[in-house]
From Swiss-Prot:
Similarity section: Belongs to the RecA family.
Main localization (coarse): cytoplasm
Positions contributing to ATP binding: G71, P72, E73, S74, S75, G76, K77, T78
Keyword DNA damage: yes
CDD domains: RecA
Protein name in the entry: Protein RecA
Pfam families (alphabetical): RecA (PF00154), RecA_C (PF21096)
Record flagged with keyword Nucleotide-binding: yes
Entry GO CC: cytosol
Source taxonomy: Bacteria, Pseudomonadati, Pseudomonadota, Alphaproteobacteria, Rickettsiales
Length: 357
């Protein structure tokens, strides 16, 4: 028994000596035990969607991490990214938009709540230039959100300078892989959110399984802490006029909370994510709003027949909408506290088991 105790003490001394040498070589904080308080609650930036914030588990996109938003054309990728920028700006954050597609609609961004006067915008000529700009912005430590729109438009310099028919195998994938190796650590230290918008392509010759894939190789899939698959489900009509789209978002990867959660919300033209639409949907799910047939009511007050009429009522009665929203957030917050409490209890049980056995 004493021999094993002496052996453990010697091992501990050797470990302490190694840690001391690492700190001398690389600085204090280069290595530490988790119980020393290095891990804290992950800060987040809201996505502008109550349902999506809940599905992500921490109230939005995690700071200090890389996020990928991908989906088909006109599915709401840029809209979601602009909402994140708007939410960050509301809290005094500095944001940048790397418009590699040269297609940013300033008027639309303004309608979504983005302060375009303070938004930093770059329209780079090459993929290398775009990623260098991202690196400089991240290293400044003064940026909260950077959006790159899109990965598919990050064209390598060799491809731009070459002829139209030249073949450049894997150039973009190598470029992105090299850039992400450099960006991952500095994004974490700068505590900013780096959002890559990506497009979908089809694999040739796939008979079984999903033929869809994203551009830029596999590096972004590995380096992303959160990956969102956003799809347009159906059109929202006012009589015969299409006024928006019902949108589905699936969290296909999440390193900070349980993944594979799925949410639905409405994206309205010239408005973005419909907040009142989400309030109605979440209110019905949480039994705050009563739904009988096609009629919606709250506290015995009829909101309207059909979802669009109920949305119109809440837009006209902001106090009622705010009251319902606060109840929704209160219930969701209490659910998160319960899950955190259960996680702490499980951790304590594991510690007791290790001590006993």
């Amino acid at each position: 028994m004493s021999d094993s105790k002496n052996l453990n003490q010697e091992r501990q001394k050797a470990l302490d000596s190694a840690i001391s040498q690492i700190e001398k070589a690389f600085g204090r904080g280069a290595i530490m035990k988790l119980k020393q308080g290095a891990i804290e609650k992950i800060d987040s930036i809201s996505t502008g969607s109550i349902a999506l914030d809940t599905a992500l588990g921490i109230g939005g996109f995690p700071k200090g991490r890389i996020v990928e938003i991908f989906g088909p054309e006109s599915s709401g990728k840029t809209t979601l990214a602009l909402h994140v920028i708007a939410e960050s700006q509301k809290k005094g954050g500095n944001c940048a938009f790397i418009d590699a597609e040269h297609a940013l609609d300033i008027m639309y961004a303004r309608k979504l709540g983005v302060n375009t006067g303070d938004l930093i915008v770059s329209q780079p000529d090459t993929g290398e230039q775009a990623l260098h700009i991202v690196e400089y912005l991240v290293c400044s430590g003064a940026i909260d959100v950077i959006v790159v729109d899109s990965v598919a438009a990050l064209t390598p310099r060799a491809e731009i300078e070459g002829d139209m028919g030249d073949q450049h195998m894997g150039l973009q994938a190598r470029l992105l892989s090299h850039a992400l190796r450099k960006l991952t650590s500095i994004v974490s230290k700068a505590n900013c959110v780096l959002i890559f918008i990506n497009q979908i392509r089809m694999k040739i010759g796939v008979v079984y399984g999903n033929p869809e894939t994203t551009t830029g190789g596999n590096a972004l899939k590995f380096y992303s802490s959160v990956r969102l698959d956003i799809r347009k489900v159906s059109a929202i009509k006012d009589k015969d006029v299409i006024i928006g789209n019902q949108t589905k978002v699936k969290v296909v990867k999440n390193k900070v909370a349980p993944p594979f959660k799925q949410v639905d919300f409405d994206i309205m033209y010239n408005e973005g994510i419909s907040k009142v639409g989400e309030i109605i949907d979440m209110g019905v799910k949480l039994n705050i709003i009563e739904k009988a047939g096609s009629y919606y009511s709250y506290n015995s007050v009829r909101l309207g027949q059909g979802k669009e009429n109920a949305k119109s009522y809440l837009k006209a009665n902001c106090d009622t909408a705010h009251e319902i929203e606060q109840k929704i957030r209160s219930i969701l917050a209490s659910d998160n506290e319960v899950s955190c409490f259960n996680a702490e209890v499980n951790d304590n049980l594991h510690e007791v088991e290790e001590t006993v056995f």
